[in-house]
């Protein structure tokens, strides 16, 4: 016989909407209270999904996030909240822990009208940059030789494969 010990949810990676957390906490509290009515006390609430992190312009105010999530837990669970509340900060803690170094392997200029320059690098969707698909995560891109004498140009950044999903940046 299985004995439930807790409730866990995942609001989605890089979730910036506090309303999504509020909704998940509200649903969890209703499930928790239904079990409580049946005499089953669960000791854990795992609020998963990870707190959003800084990739380009968005910066998480972790104090605001934590405070609003805690207020939501207190409001929805009241006096009957689980003894242990587990958070999964995820990439909020580790996103800045690494750097990907890539080399340009090809630069092309298409010949048809209104064509843009394409820059291909040796890292792509299938070897390190899967989460950039659809520009969901916009990594900061810097040249290792950031010399001011070079002019800045607009281009499409793509990985090394022929897969149409291996495009890193279209809007630059």
Regions found by a protein language model. Give the residues of each.
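Charged (often Lys/Glu-rich) extended helix/loop segments that serve as interaction or gating elements
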Residues: 68, 80-172
């Amino acid at each position: 016989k299985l004995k439930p010990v807790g409730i866990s949810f995942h609001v989605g990676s890089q979730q910036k909407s506090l309303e999504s957390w509020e909704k998940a906490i509200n649903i969890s509290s209703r499930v928790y209270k239904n079990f409580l009515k049946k005499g089953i006390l669960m000791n854990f609430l795992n609020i998963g999904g990870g707190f959003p992190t800084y990739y380009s312009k968005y910066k998480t105010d972790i104090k605001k996030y934590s405070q609003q999530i805690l207020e939501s837990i207190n409001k929805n669970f009241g006096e009957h909240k689980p003894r242990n509340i587990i958070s999964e900060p995820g990439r909020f803690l580790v996103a800045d822990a690494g750097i990907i170094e890539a080399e340009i392997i090809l630069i092309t200029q298409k010949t048809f009208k209104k064509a843009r320059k394409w820059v291909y690098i040796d890292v792509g969707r299938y070897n390190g940059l899967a989460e950039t698909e659809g520009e969901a995560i916009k990594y900061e891109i810097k040249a290792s030789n950031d010399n001011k004498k070079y002019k800045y140009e607009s281009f499409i950044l793509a990985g090394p494969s022929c897969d149409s999903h291996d495009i890193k940046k279209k809007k630059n």
